[in-house]
Amino acid sequence: GAPPRRRAMNLPPLREVIARHGLSASKALGQNFLFDEQLLDRIAAIPGDLAGRDVLEIGPGPGGLTRALLRAGASVTAIEMDRRCLPALAELEDAFPGKLRVIEGDAIKIDPATLFAGAYDIVANLPYNVGTALFTGWLAGARGHENDWPPQWRSLTLMFQLEVAQRIVSEPGSGAYGRLAVLAQWRARARLAMKVHRSAFTPPPKVMSAIVHIEPSAMPQGV
């Protein structure tokens, strides 16, 4: 066969993969698929140079963002509970030998610390129905290790509904300021990295989306 880099560059378009596997975004699982490969590459660039780094992706679906992360040189561990998507992800495993590990399961029930020996980045177009719960869990720290800071993750690059993203990065005293901002800014730095128009998704969600990038502070702010 072709060398790995050639194989990786010759991937069929995402739309073709989705059509071939008969995939459609599941409303029950809070899925919205992204097809724009340039946009996906821009998202994968937000955490900085990922070459040789370990990345955790939640809910990869048909693997659009997964491809972009692999193209950026990351080693990706992807947790997916929708088994319809597993054959499409298996094709990516073949195209990027040894660089993608797919775990079928529920991300809420999996402790990332069990998946990585060292530091890792989390990059995800989070399923809307579990996004906030996962996010608050990562910020709070693993049960019994809440005081271990900085955490094992190096950064979080996460897609949310725009309104949720704005709450996360809001300033004290603003109308959006509340629990999410307090949690995000207590011992981390949060910024709104990119807005994503609803038309970028299939099916288009009712609202705009945005990507928040978070890095842990060395010491909790204001302690």
Please state what every model-predicted region is:
Residues 2-223:
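Catalytic cores of RNA-modifying enzymes
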